Amino acid sequence: MDIDPYKEFGATVELLSFLPSDFFPSVRDLLDTAAALYRDALESPEHCSPHHTALRQAILCWGDLITLSTWVGTNLEDPASRDLVVSYVNSNMGLKFRQLLWFHISCLTFGRETVLEYLVSFGVWIRTPPAYRPPNAPILSTLPETTVVRRRGRSPRRRTPSPRRRRSQSPRRRRSQSRESQC
């Protein structure tokens, strides 16, 4: 089977492969980031988003892979074979997990569309011959280029909603407090 873990999110393995391997933080740093930013949602029994689900699965699979590699390292007598296993896990599997964790954390942090635009613009930049491309690579940011940042000072006058535009109070439109705080 040829399964692309990014397909349902509008990306592909090839699109992420344009980013160099040293672009992605270590798995430990990514796991710490996911825990710091999204621990409540990841540990919640409720479904928050497909990105949360994918992150949960990646974190569980990484834990299983580490358990397996620890077992192999403990039970493999030949040091050369042990080093080959560790090297393979770190270079091949480690990179795949770093890409997967980075993608889903970035989508939750910046928004899926922003991440996809970044991947496309980086892919175009990296394939452009150095003589014809700008010296700096695109940067993933929460602020699109068209955003205008206002100077400090008086904030603009806020509009109060008119009575005609009240939100419906029907039960199907209300959200539970616990879900809002976790996701």
From Swiss-Prot:
Name listed for the protein in its UniProt record: Capsid protein
Annotated source species: Hepatitis B virus genotype D subtype ayw (isolate Japan/JYW796/1988)
Chain's gene name: C
Keywords: Capsid protein, Cytoplasmic inwards viral transport, DNA-binding, Host cytoplasm, Host-virus interaction, Microtubular inwards viral transport, Phosphoprotein, Repeat, RNA-binding, T=4 icosahedral capsid protein, Viral penetration into host nucleus, Virion, Virus entry into host cell
Principal location: virion
Highest taxon of source: Viruses
Spans annotated as RNA binding: 177-183
InterPro entries according to UniProt: Hepatitis_core, Viral_capsid_core_dom_sf_HBV
UniProt region (Disordered), positions on chain: 136-183
